Amino acid sequence: ELEPGTPISQVVKADTLVEVEVTPNRPDLLSHNGMAYELAAISGRGYRPVSIDDAGVALEPAGDFVRLDQPELNPYYTAVKISGVKVQESPEWLKECLVAVGLRPINNIVDITNFVLHELGTPLHAFDAAKVQGGIVTRTAYEGETIKALDGQEYTLNCTDLVVADQSGKALAIGGVMGGEESGVTDATTDIILESAWFKPSSVRATSRRLALSSDSSYRFERGTSAWNVLRGSVRAVELILQLAGGTASPTYVAGSPVPNPAHASMPSCGGADGPVSVFASLKQGKGATVTNELGFVQLPWKALDQISGGSISHEEGARILTALGLKQVPDSPECWLIPPHRLDLTRPCDLLEEIVRVFGLDGIPSRFSGPFVAESPVDAAYNFQMELRRKLAALGFYETQ
């Protein structure tokens, strides 16, 4: 529809590319949602969270549909079966979002999983349900077991690699790294199983390095993802799939339970509460079980902020910064802070101090001595005498020899 010679600027929308160097301790920044928290705190503008309607989500114990044979490597797994989907090309807005972050659109199902990965930082995978016999089993691979991954390459696994398989024993995916080509979504797919899970970082890292196979999912899993996001990512993806591909969704089948950050789980009581608490709504699984997202406390004495900043940062500004970063003050305990589950790196008072000073900016803290007087030692006096003597002798024409 365009005439030859049409300027590219009239076809491609203007955009701004921002490259961010993310340190290994900040996996929360590997998503637009996490980056929004950061920008809100630095700019002082409000944070608008992604709207996820989880009020009507039905959770059920997975039972025989999902079996975790290696819970130390994969303690938490959720699956949703969506029947009657129409696999087709994604709408323009979705394709534009993926192209903007350097991804190639494939189809609406795969594109949605990639979109949620970058939006929330939750790795997801969709299986063609017709290629899955029985249910899902996560286990370690058999020695010498092979799988052809989505990149078209065949990989030989060993007994330390985690795989997602079906109940016939066939490997469907390399856990946390990449899905298998045979069970992938195609244009002929009508029913899918959506996976959202938490895999042990060290396991994913070891498999990814040994196979020389990296993906956007493994990049996040090996740095540590929040168990809090497992359910949120699934709910968000199901919502988009029903909108763009149609179909009917089953309840969310849950196997295992979220693993809280070990450092948070070991924190002492604070603000009158004992141990970690849940501030994310508990959702009924049935049979009395609940899915919760555990948070930890960090006690931050404001006098520590006064000492490190020399009084340059007010308590109110410190509280504003922490609140903008997603932390919450415990009622009636202004020095006690609830850590958001996506901030796995905040476990000590010094971590909170670092966040405040980093966002406030070191340039805003004036350099000055801690007191009006500087003590002088005998060593200083001897050095000063030697230097003065050298200057006087040099002025008289003498040369110093060593």
Predicted feature residues:
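Generic low-complexity, intrinsically disordered sequence content enriched
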Residues: K284-K287, G326, G397
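Structured aminoacyl-transfer and RNA-binding surfaces used for tRNA recognition/handling
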Residues: P105, Y399-Q402
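RNA/tRNA-interacting regions in translation and RNA-turnover enzymes
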Residues: E1-N261, V291-L362, P366-A382, M387-A394
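Cys/His-rich finger/ribbon microdomains and the adjacent scaffold used
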Residues: G44-R48, G272, E400
